[in-house]
């Protein structure tokens, strides 16, 4: 039989255990709140991005067409520019064959490290001879070097010079690897680009073809879903799945009443996420 003192001790111990448990719960909760707050503040203050984060089209700033671009769309109706990055490659000739078959001119943004491969240079010359535009896509395609180490203009100059040496043309249009945002957000580097007479082109539709190996149908669907305006610039790459998808992409735009256009330096269309009308 428990005495009153025993009852008191039991109640005291129970209250003590509850009090300790409550303090423990409060301590853990406070720690978790502080941890979550710290992680949030760090994530909000981050100023660098990985290429994987940068290339997501959902995070893109909508392109604000220049008045010249609006006039072109009004004068010509629906216009689409097919663009191909990362060449020249072993697929360049096949892309040119397919484009020739459909009587379509395209815009290529070629990489310096590939342009230096002499066995691919005939395809670069052929592209220009057949009426396509060849612009620059940097020498290295390295985000850190181009944007953080401020080598964008020197690399583009070197790549444009290579194109001139191979083709005799003097292009001024470049496509920033991973797009112009956020790498070219600094006005200082944009001033350098403008002073160098370089023009930038981003895109209105990212096909995401580079990540869709063996999925040409998904590439086509991405482009269909992204097509919303009378003036579209489609980002693609020299990939096997892109080559396979291209006939369906061409047929889609023909059915939708689009005309295929190639970049013309005398009629520059502003097409950069930065909305910088100098570029």
State the predicted function of each range.
Residues 1-22:
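N-terminal Lys/Arg-rich, disordered targeting/topogenic segments
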Residues 22-24, 176:
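Hydrophobic alpha-helical segments, especially transmembrane helices
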Residues 25-41:
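Hydrophobic membrane-insertion alpha-helices, especially the h-region
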Residues 38-58:
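Sec-dependent signal peptide cleavage junction
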Residues 52-147, 151-165:
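Active-site beta->alpha N-cap acidic-glycine motif
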Residues 99, 117-119, 211-213, 270-273:
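Short, charged, surface-exposed secondary-structure boundary motifs
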Residues 141-265, 273-278:
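Catalytic domains of cell-wall/extracellular-matrix polysaccharide-remodeling enzymes
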């Amino acid at each position: 039989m428990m005495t009153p003192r025993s009852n008191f001790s039991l109640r005291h111990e129970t209250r003590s255990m509850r009090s300790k448990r409550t303090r423990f719960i409060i301590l853990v909760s406070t720690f978790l709140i502080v941890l979550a707050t710290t992680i949030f503040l760090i994530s909000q203050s981050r100023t660098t991005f990985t290429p994987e984060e940068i290339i997501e089209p959902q995070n893109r700033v909508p392109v604000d067409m220049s008045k010249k671009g609006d006039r072109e769309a009004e004068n010509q109706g629906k216009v689409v520019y097919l663009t191909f990055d990362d060449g020249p490659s072993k697929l360049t000739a096949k892309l040119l064959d397919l484009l020739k078959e459909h009587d379509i001119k395209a815009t290529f943004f070629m990489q310096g490290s590939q342009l230096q491969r002499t066995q691919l240079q005939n395809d670069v010359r052929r592209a220009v001879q057949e009426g396509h535009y060849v612009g620059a896509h940097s020498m290295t395609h390295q985000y850190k070097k181009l944007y953080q180490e401020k080598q964008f203009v020197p690399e583009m100059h070197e790549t444009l010079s290579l194109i001139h040496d191979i083709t005799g043309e003097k292009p001024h249009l470049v496509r920033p690897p991973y797009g112009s945002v956020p790498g070219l957000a600094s006005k200082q580097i944009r001033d350098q680009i403008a002073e160098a007479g370089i023009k930038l082109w981003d895109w209105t539709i990212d096909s995401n073809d580079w990540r869709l190996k063996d999925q040409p149908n998904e590439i086509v669907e991405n482009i269909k879903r992204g097509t919303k305006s009378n003036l579209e610039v489609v980002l693609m790459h020299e990939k096997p799945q892109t080559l396979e998808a291209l006939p369906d992409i061409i047929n889609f735009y023909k059915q939708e009443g689009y005309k295929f256009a190639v970049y013309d330096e005398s009629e520059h269309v502003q097409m950069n996420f930065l909305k910088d009308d100098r570029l």
